[in-house]
Amino acid sequence: MEANTRSTGRLPAAFLTPGSSSFMDFLSEHQPEILPGNRQLPPTQGVIEAPHGTTIVATTFPGGVVLAGDRRATMGNVIAQRDIEKVFPADEYSAVGIAGTAGLAVEMVKLFQLELEHFEKVEGATLSLEGKANRLSTMIRSNLAMAMQGLAVVPLFAGYDVDREKGRIFSYDVTGGRSEEHGYASTGSGSIFARGAMKKLYRDDLTEQQATTLVIQALYDAADDDSATGGPDVARRIYPIVTVITEDGFRRLTDEESSEIARAILERRLEQPDGPRAALL
């Protein structure tokens, strides 16, 4: 795409030549230097300090899936940002939540969104949910060199499978390894605490309202034990981002909806600081 086309007003030939339905393949052929996996960092001593996103959680319910994230980004032992957004729509029926190096993760999400949009425009149809999960896996794998230098991206992907008519969740490791999770999942620094909370609260017959309450309960428990995870911040009116994906598509809860659930949880926590108690039998 080096040819000067400004004088003629024409698009470069690369844009007019039939090719792959993958936007990443297009970039690899014509501008490979802008792909994340082709960037090389100079040798460094120690860990590179960069803002990191922390905890993402997801749970399924009959009819869909809920994906949510806290709002805190940390850099070492410092709170780098209190209102970062970590959950994004991938397309109409899927979403991705980011944990790991925030800047690289957001860039990866934007590239993923372009990948899905490009495929739909070229093929005239959307990728299956499995196909989307596989494309994201490839992107994560391409970031492995950066991950080895401490700049890992480990997202959580969730969506509504229009073929199977149910919500599904996919988790990843830094090498791009993909696993389908059943019922609930979490990633990030507070994931072990969030997962423990969801393990005790999850059940197969959750309503959408109960599922959104469950993920905020899990994020609250994660923030209670993990300093890198931010809980509901009533003073600053900062609440977790909660998204719901059903047969009607992607929907993000409004700040009013999220705050209403968070405030109800906080009110109950005044009586039970450790949260709801599961039955012993």
From Swiss-Prot:
UniProt xrefs under SUPFAM superfamilies: N-terminal nucleophile aminohydrolases (Ntn hydrolases)
Name of a matching Pfam family: Proteasome
EC numbers on record: 3.4.25.1
Major subcellular site: cytoplasm
Keyword Nucleotide-binding: no
Signal peptide interval: none
Subunit field text: The 20S proteasome core is composed of 14 alpha and 14 beta subunits that assemble into four stacked heptameric rings, resulting in a barrel-shaped structure. The two inner rings, each composed of seven catalytic beta subunits, are sandwiched by two outer rings, each composed of seven alpha subunits. The catalytic chamber with the active sites is on the inside of the barrel. Has a gated structure, the ends of the cylinder being occluded by the N-termini of the alpha-subunits. Is capped by the proteasome-associated ATPase, ARC.
Listed NCBIfam families: 20S_bact_beta
Protein family per UniProt: Belongs to the peptidase T1B family.
The protein's name in its UniProt record: Proteasome subunit beta 2
Source organism of this protein record: Streptomyces avermitilis (strain ATCC 31267 / DSM 46492 / JCM 5070 / NBRC 14893 / NCIMB 12804 / NRRL 8165 / MA-4680)
Phylogenetic classification of the source organism: Bacteria, Bacillati, Actinomycetota, Actinomycetes, Kitasatosporales
Chain's gene name: prcB2
